[in-house]
């Protein structure tokens, strides 16, 4: 079974680590963040759910890249969040530096991992990770469509007062410039 590292213990990263653990499809999940105590706390919360939800995935939190050694898959969610009034393009310079540093540290400790970038703006961050990694292009890719589509379906479900399970929608955009519906439906 695989070892997966999730870099960034914010909402998206912590949720990713939690879901991976609950699915019980990997041996170990490492949740890494520059705020090591936060990563440790969220990882501990997830690990302590194991006896109740009956999974065996090990979950650890850290701020030390050495703990990511041997990762088969790395999910990068790290970056500054978008604040009100900011576009995703406003994040480019800062988040590109973060993603570059993260990627360089990851490849120092893991041989030929698959890197999945979630940080925004996704297209630019994926390129930054690819260039910093030195890996083959088949090893680095970005994932945004599922998350953005899920958010869109949730917005529509709320606006229409129905279950999100009843909404079928797919967004096919490189970037979404909305954070909430712009008008009621």
Q: Language-model segments: what does each one mean?
A:
Residues 9-10:
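Glycine-rich Rossmann-fold phosphate-binding loop(s) that bind the pyrophosphate
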Residues 13-14:
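N-terminal Rossmann-fold NAD(P) dinucleotide-binding loop
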Residues 32-71:
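Conserved N-terminal Rossmann-fold NAD(P) cofactor-binding segment
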Residues 74-75:
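N-terminal Rossmann-like NAD(P) cofactor-binding module of classical short-chain dehydrogenase/reductase
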Residues 78-80:
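Conserved NAD(P)H cofactor-binding loop of Rossmann-fold oxidoreductase domains
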Residues 87-153:
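Rossmann-like NAD(P)(H) cofactor-binding subdomain of soluble oxidoreductases
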Residues 176-185:
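Single conserved hydrophobic/aromatic residue that forms the stacking wall/gate
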């Amino acid at each position: 079974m695989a070892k997966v590292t999730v870099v960034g213990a914010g909402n998206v990263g912590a949720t990713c680590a939690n879901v991976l653990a609950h699915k019980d499809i990997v041996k170990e999940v490492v949740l890494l963040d520059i705020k090591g105590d936060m990563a440790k706390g969220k990882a501990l919360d997830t690990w302590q759910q194991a006896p109740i939800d009956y999974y065996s995935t090990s979950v650890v939190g850290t701020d030390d890249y050495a703990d990511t050694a041997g990762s088969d898959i790395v999910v990068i969610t790290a970056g500054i969040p978008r604040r009100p009034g900011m576009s995703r393009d406003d994040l480019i310079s800062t988040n590109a530096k973060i993603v570059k540093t993260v990627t360089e540290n990851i490849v120092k400790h893991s041989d030929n991992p698959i890197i999945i970038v979630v940080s925004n703006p996704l297209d630019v961050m994926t390129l930054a990770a690819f260039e910093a990694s030195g890996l083959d292009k088949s090893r680095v890719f970005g994932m945004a469509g599922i998350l953005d589509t899920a958010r869109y379906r949730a917005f529509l479900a709320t606006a229409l007062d129905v279950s999100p399970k009843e909404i079928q929608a797919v967004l096919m955009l490189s970037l979404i410039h909305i954070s909430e519906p712009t008008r009621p439906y």
